[in-house]
């Protein structure tokens, strides 16, 4: 009887530790979903002042005034935290295939990376456009969500959506690559291409001295056949995004719910054993 009680105690303790972590992630996920819904309802584009800030930033990028800095380097100065955008969320990154939805900030400061993904200093803002390349950095995982944990699972053709202002920009993954943390020429714009690059640490364990890149492109073709095919893809992509917009939680929430049911069941069985043990002692 005592061995059974000890066994149930071990199972409960072993279950409780990851369950608390998953519960924290689920709560964060629900909060982010409502924050996203609030953003969609209130977002009305950028003000004239913000448009001027955007133009000033893009001009600084084109002229090379802003240096590209590794957002995960321990020795870096936190210069990205100084942004004319302050703590304004400029948009949302959505990857339905990986169940990722993250707010986008300007400037990959520690504070911004704690809360979502951020535009790497020295790269374009994610508005799209030829000869532009926006790089969005995010942690491989964080205390409250998986963030870019599954980024290595992305495959060619997977869709990435950037909702910014009143605009939705759709990219399709072309390739992934792993570079050294100092190999920043890999993030330069590509002539006549509109590129979005997602960046995170690699491998999953220290010393994190490499970077995983996911490169996604927008396709531009003015031919009649291409325009027709592009419209079909656009409608399909829009349907995917609309479906994902309504999705509030990921599989982690369902796993957490199942875990709590299991926890209650084990606690009930343990309590029953303890009561039987007490009755046996009394007799």
Predicted regions and their residues:
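Solvent-exposed, non-transmembrane regions of membrane-associated and secreted proteins
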Residues: 3-155, 159-251, 268-276
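A cross-kingdom C-terminal cell-surface attachment/processing module
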Residues: 256-271
């Amino acid at each position: 009887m005592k061995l059974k009680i000890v066994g149930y105690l071990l199972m409960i303790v072993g279950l409780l530790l990851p369950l608390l972590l998953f519960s924290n992630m689920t709560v964060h996920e629900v909060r982010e979903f409502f924050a996203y819904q609030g953003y969609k309802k209130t977002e009305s584009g950028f003000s004239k002042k913000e448009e001027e800030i955007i133009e000033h930033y893009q001009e600084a990028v084109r002229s090379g005034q802003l240096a590209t800095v590794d957002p995960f380097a321990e020795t870096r100065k936190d210069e990205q935290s100084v942004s004319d955008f302050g703590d304004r969320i400029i948009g949302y990154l959505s990857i339905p295939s990986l169940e990722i939805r993250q707010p986008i900030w300007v400037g990959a400061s520690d504070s911004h990376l704690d809360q979502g993904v951020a535009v790497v200093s020295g790269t374009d803002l994610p508005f799209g456009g030829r000869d532009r390349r926006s790089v969005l950095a995010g942690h491989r995982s964080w205390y409250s969500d998986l963030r870019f944990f599954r980024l290595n699972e992305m495959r060619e053709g997977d869709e990435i959506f950037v909702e910014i202002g009143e605009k939705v920009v759709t990219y399709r993954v072309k390739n992934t690559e792993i570079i050294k943390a100092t190999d920043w020429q890999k993030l330069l714009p590509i002539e006549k291409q509109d590129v979005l690059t997602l960046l995170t640490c690699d491998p999953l364990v220290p010393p994190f001295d490499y970077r995983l890149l996911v490169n996604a492109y927008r396709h531009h073709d003015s031919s009649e056949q291409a325009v027709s095919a592009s419209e079909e893809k656009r409608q399909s992509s829009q349907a995917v995004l609309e479906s994902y917009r309504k999705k509030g939680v990921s599989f982690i929430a369902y796993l957490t719910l199942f875990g709590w049911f299991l926890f209650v069941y084990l606690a009930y069985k343990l309590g029953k054993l303890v009561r039987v043990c007490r009755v046996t002692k009394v007799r």
